[in-house]
Amino acid sequence: MAKKSVIARNEKRIKLVAKYAELRAELVKAGDYEALRKLPRDSSATRVRNRCVLTGRGRGVYAKFGLCRHMFRKLSLEGKLPGIRKASW
C-alpha cells in the first residue's frame, strides 16, 4: 500500500492537469513557451502517475483496468472482473 501522502500528491496533480489542460493546449498551439514555463510544474500531464485504485501501487498497473498486477490477478481469479478469465489452450 502506498503512503497516503503519495496518493494525495498524485490526486492533486490530476486536479491541476484538468484545471490547466485548455490553457496549456492553447499555449502549445501558439508556441508561447515563456507562458508555458510560468504555469505550475504539476499542471503537466507527464507528472501524473498511473496508480492502482485499490492499493495506490505505482508500478505494474494495467491502465485499462486501473489495477496493479496483484489486485488484477486476485480479482480475476475470484471472478470479480467481468469478462476476464484465466487463459487455457
Swiss-Prot record:
InterPro entries found in the cross-reference section: Ribosomal_uS14 (IPR001209), Ribosomal_uS14_bac/plastid (IPR023036), Ribosomal_uS14_CS (IPR018271), Ribosomal_uS14_sf (IPR043140)
Protein task: Binds 16S rRNA, required for the assembly of 30S particles and may also be responsible for determining the conformation of the 16S rRNA at the A site.
Pfam families: Ribosomal_S14 (PF00253)
Any one GO molecular-function label of the UniProt entry: structural constituent of ribosome
Keywords, ordered alphabetically: Ribonucleoprotein, Ribosomal protein, RNA-binding, rRNA-binding
Protein's recorded name: Small ribosomal subunit protein uS14
Lineage: Bacteria, Pseudomonadati, Chlorobiota, Chlorobiia, Chlorobiales
PANTHER family in alphabetical order: 30S RIBOSOMAL PROTEIN S14, SMALL RIBOSOMAL SUBUNIT PROTEIN US14M
Signal peptide from the UniProt entry: none
UniProt-listed HAMAP family: Ribosomal_uS14_1
GO cellular component: cytoplasm; small ribosomal subunit
GO BP terms, alphabetized: translation
Alphabetized PROSITE patterns for the sequence: RIBOSOMAL_S14
Recorded family membership: Belongs to the universal ribosomal protein uS14 family.
